[in-house]
Swiss-Prot record:
Domain remark in the UniProt entry: The PPC domain mediates interactions between AHL proteins.
UniProt cross-references to PROSITE patterns, sorted A to Z: PPC
PANTHER family with a match to the protein in the record: AT-HOOK MOTIF NUCLEAR-LOCALIZED PROTEIN 7, AT-HOOK MOTIF NUCLEAR-LOCALIZED PROTEIN 9
UniProt gene name: AHL7
DNA-binding region: 56-68
Biased composition (Basic and acidic residues): 243-256
Annotated function: Transcription factor that specifically binds AT-rich DNA sequences related to the nuclear matrix attachment regions (MARs).
Positions of region (Disordered): 1-76, 241-318
Sequence motif: Bipartite nuclear localization signal, positions: 56-64
Biased composition range(s): Pro residues: 264-274
Protein's name according to its UniProt entry: AT-hook motif nuclear-localized protein 7
Amino acid sequence: METSDRISPGGGIGAEVPSAYHMAPRPSDSPANQFMGLSLPPMEAPMPSSGEASGKKRRGRPRKYEANGAPLPSSSVPLVKKRVRGKLNGFDMKKMHKTIGFHSSGERFGVGGGVGGGVGSNFTPHVITVNTGEDITMRIISFSQQGPRAICILSANGVISNVTLRQPDSCGGTLTYEGRFEILSLSGSFMETENQGSKGRSGGMSVSLAGPDGRVVGGGVAGLLIAATPIQVVVGSFITSDQQDHQKPRKQRVEHAPAAVMSVPPPPSPPPPAASVFSPTNPDREQPPSSFGISSWTNGQDMPRNSATDINISLPVD
C-alpha cells in the first residue's frame, strides 16, 4: 500500500523532513528497525560548503577571488553602496541646519547667549521678581534702562490688585480696575531710542486679566499695574540691528608708502699691482712698495720665472 507519508529513521511516520534538517545515520540493525521489520540504508550527511565549514561569518570585505586564485563572478560579489557624507536619503544636512538655526560651525542659537553675528542673536532670558505692592510697569522699565540692550516681555504669573488700561473703543480714554485679577498673559517690548542726542526708551505692554467672576478684561497698560502677590516676569534681552551696526569695528585702511629707491655707487676698482723695486746694493733686499699696494701682492712662487734670462750686475772691485 503506497502512502504519501515518509517513515522517519526513529520509527515514526511524519511529513517530509525539510532539506535543512539532517539526522545522523543509525545502524540498520537498530531495535526500532528490527521491530518494524524494515531495513533502511544509512543516510549520508551532505558535505558542508566552504562558507559553512568555517562555522563563523567572515568579517570585512567580501572575497573577490576563490581559493584557487580564480576571480569570482561579478554577480556573487555584493555591491555595497557608499553613504554620502552630510546627506541622509537625499536630504542635505546643511540646509536642515540653516532651517533650525545652526551655523556651519555646529553651534545653535540657544538660550543664555547663543552665537553672535546675526540680527536678533545673543538672546538672553531674565526673570524679574516683583514684590507685593510694587508697580510691575516701573520695575520692567527700570530693568530695561540698565543697559543698551532691547528687551521683550515673554510671560508673567501672579495676581494684581489695581490696573489702568487703555481701551481702543473709549476714544483714547483709560479705565481703572480694582480688585483681584489673575494675569493670563503679559507681553510687550522696550527699545533704546536716540532723539537729538538724548537717549530714551520707547515701547509698551499689553495684559489680559481674569476676574473672580470669570470675566476677562485686557488692553494696553496705561498706568499702574500693582502686584497683589509676588509676581514673576520673564523677559528676554537682545541686540537690535541698529546696535549691531554701531558695534561693528571699522577696518582701518593702511596705505603702504612706496619704498625710496636709493642709488648705490659702484665699488671702486682696485689699483694696479705695484712692481717690486730691486736695490743694486743689496740684491737680497727688496724695497716694499707703497702701503696701498700690499693687498694686491701675489706670491712669488706663483709667478713663472724664465731660467734663461739672468740679471748681470757689475760689482765694484776692491
